[in-house]
Amino acid sequence: MVKIAFGSIGDSFSVASIKAYVAEFIATLLFVFAGVGSAIAYNKLTSDAALDPAGLVAVAVAHAFALFVGVSMAANVSGGHLNPAVTLGLAVGGNITILTGLFYWIAQCLGSTVACLLLKFVTNGLSVPTHGVAAGMDAIQGVVMEIIITFALVYTVYATAADPKKGSLGVIAPIAIGFIVGANILAAGPFSGGSMNPARSFGPAVASGDFSQNWIYWAGPLIGGALAGFIYGDVFITAHAPLPTSEDYA
């Protein structure tokens, strides 16, 4: 049974909810600053050479470490989503309301955009790399790739963080989430870029002014996240605690 709840304005603008939005903004900003910053640093060190295996590993590790830290720092305030696809997946499973989830999206996209604009400023106008599918691939292949890897990410979030039966496994949730993102970037980076995160792709698109393929990184991750939320949140988790009231973020 689908557990989606729309929510209310009162809950979405409670003090706890506003704190959650600020936490998502800050954590996403820091994650994207480190992740995109690693790609900019690679381009500078190699004079914009094509990404080689060592560079791919470096970028994947930077994203994995930064996400691990970002999720850890926001987990106790907002749940540590840092990603619209994660938020949607959790909404499909009834862990957050649609209305509050939309404000999470805004906070995440703003955090990513500010991070990329800051990077452009502090690097004296160096190019901010955007996600795009590799030569020889079409957009549909890129969408399917992003669906698969985002499904893996959100499924991991459910298994290690959202499942009420997780027990002590929840302690390692940020590590597991960082690991799956790093692994997926290693697998998908040369093909779709390995985004898994519409906000992560949106910020660079704003900073560079290039939205030509940005839709791929909304469609794929959101579909993958929703599928994972439905399968784990609505099929595997048969009982669900009521959504929190305005005393907590909704």
Curated annotation (Swiss-Prot):
Disulfide bonds: none annotated. It comes from the Eukaryota. Gene3D superfamilies: Glycerol uptake facilitator protein (1.20.1080.10). Expressed in mature seeds and dark-grown seedlings. One of its GO terms (molecular function) is water channel activity. It is a multi-pass membrane protein. A motif (NPA 2) lies at residues 197-199. CDD domains: MIP. The keyword Cell division does not apply. Signal peptide: none annotated. It is found in: Vacuole membrane. A motif (NPA 1) lies at residues 83-85. Pfam families: MIP. Keywords: Membrane, Repeat, Transmembrane, Transmembrane helix, Transport, Vacuole. Its main location: membrane. The keyword Transport applies. The chain crosses the membrane at residues 20-42, 55-77, 97-119, 140-162, 172-194, 215-237. GO terms for cellular component: plant-type vacuole membrane. Channel protein in tonoplast. These proteins may allow the diffusion of amino acids and/or peptides from the vacuolar compartment to the cytoplasm. Belongs to the MIP/aquaporin (TC 1.A.8) family. TIP (TC 1.A.8.10) subfamily. Aquaporins contain two tandem repeats each containing three membrane-spanning domains and a pore-forming loop with the signature motif Asn-Pro-Ala (NPA). This is Probable aquaporin TIP-type. It comes from Antirrhinum majus. The gene is DIP.
